[in-house]
């Protein structure tokens, strides 16, 4: 089987993509690759200066790219609402939403009182997706791609207290998959052409570990470098989920090599609990209550 690479990304001219956390790492590489194929790319980032610097870097390799920068702090529901409002004011459709931004190793709470990894990685993206979903529904064949992690298999979620206990990062990444599968079921039931997919980068050397303790950060970066997982390689599963004409709603992409740490993107299988429909439904209900965001599907 031929390895899927950036060369396989179809033309994206006329399409609008929103990428969260697009200023660095996998998010930057995702935005760059989409811009090179002609997409209008919205870089939705917490640090506006870094986002603008990323846009300059993309313009160096894609001078004709149409780029937009929107401030987005996923640790603040007020910021999420403001970002959604800015996106809606500037764009009348979204063909692709990539929920990429993430944190790990941070302690503390979001502005709204949620455990920060669960709040940023899951609840912030849940809110953003709901607030712009009608723009996706307007675009035939649009996609929502949410970036999870191989670490989701260690996650456990108690929907009575979803952000409590140890293993916050794994829990948030499990939530990403539960959200994806529940969103896909709802879209399918509604007869929408919009689809929900997920991806994970394998072991890629990115800034997601920058807040982690050394005992966690250093081994992860060593593994990434040992197996040659640059951010550009780490972005390939996301890009395949986002653009491959053969990708279908509910598909999950990751590296096809040993332990899904390295290799080119292929369809992979999430842990059984990520497919728990009852858990997905209950997490959805809790997420709606915590964010005060309801969905049109």
Regions found by a protein language model. Name each.
Residues 271-297:
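C-terminal amphipathic/interface module of NAD(P)-dependent oxidoreductases
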Residues 43, 72, 226, 272-275:
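Pocket-edge positions in alpha/beta enzyme catalytic cores
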Residues 221-268, 277-281:
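C-terminal helical subdomain
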Residues 159-164, 214-222, 262-271:
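Short glycine/proline- and charge-enriched loop/turn segments
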Residues 151-153, 252, 274, 284-285:
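Short linear elements at protein peripheries
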Residues 79, 124, 175, 230-233, ...:
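Soluble or luminal CAZymes and related metallo-dependent hydrolases
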Residues 1-212, 289-297:
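Rossmann-fold NAD(P)H-dependent dehydrogenase/reductase core
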Residues 182, 237-240, 286:
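Generic recognition of well-ordered alpha-helical segments
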